[in-house]
Amino acid sequence: MASNKLISILVLVVTLLLQGDNNYVVEAQLTTNFYSTSCPNLLSTVQTAVKSAVNSEARMGASILRLFFHDCFVNGCDGSILLDDTSSFTGEQNAAPNRNSARGFNVIDNIKSAVEKACPGVVSCADILAIAARDSVVALGGPNWNVKVGRRDARTASQAAANSNIPAPTSSLSQLISSFSAVGLSTRDMVALSGAHTIGQSRCTNFRARIYNETNINAAFATTRQRTCPRASGSGDGNLAPLDVTTAASFDNNYFKNLMTQRGLLHSDQVLFNGGSTDSIVRGYSNNPSSFNSDFTAAMIKMGDISPLTGSSGEIRKVCGRTN
């Protein structure tokens, strides 16, 4: 009887692993040397292309990093954000968080084209995006890390999931914590990954309410932002402002220093330092850039592990914007 009970328990455990949240199982299938034999020049090919793109326009580094973030938060890091709309499904590119703001697709397409010439049918678009995100950070002076690869590409995308899963710029602290927790990321991961706003820009429509209505904002900073972001909705909606007012083209810890002086551009930025549970993390990153870099790279690796397609799941797209 005892033997039968033990067998039953083992069967239950295996079943739960196979049917339940199997991120740990999938994680083990991603490795840093997945393409070392099948596409040995992959990393140098991606790095060269990203460097060229960022040298031409520093903002592109932030755009590629954002693409990766928005990809991973919608059904995992599967390259679904790269898919164009088709007659059979509406993709993620025109979801509210991405419409008129997601960019960098041409850079990923160019990299994919170069990789296909060298290693046809081998490297996924999902992996190219993951590597390009890392190289974008490095190109702007940020930390380096080893990217785990071995992902495959999704055959579909979900606008509904993009609308519901990607945190809004108006998110409260509790909403941010909840959104990140839903994909297995901790509060500390969330604050570290928010530090990606040390680079890039945002549209007036995303911060208008903050600069006109909120009180936890530096007055001079608000006045400066108001000059290019009119109060009336529909006027200047697409006008851009740097997320990091001090060093927008350098990956550093000034984003956190700005929060401590109430110069966070987005509502979802400033809530990280507003008398809440994350104040101490922001203060720590502001004082210790090495701590931020270390936590950021760890969080990026962890985010890259969100529900990847591996093995025989998905496909290796020939062109990133469409399925095979």
Curated annotation (Swiss-Prot):
Site positions for Transition state stabilizer: 66
Reaction(s) catalysed by this chain's protein: 2 a phenolic donor + H2O2 = 2 a phenolic radical donor + 2 H2O
Binding site for Ca(2+) 2: 198, 244, 247, 252
Disulfide bond annotation, renumbered to this chain: 39-119, 72-77, 125-320, 204-229
EC number: 1.11.1.7
Binding site for substrate: 167
Name the record gives this protein: Peroxidase 52
Source organism: Arabidopsis thaliana
Gene label: PER52
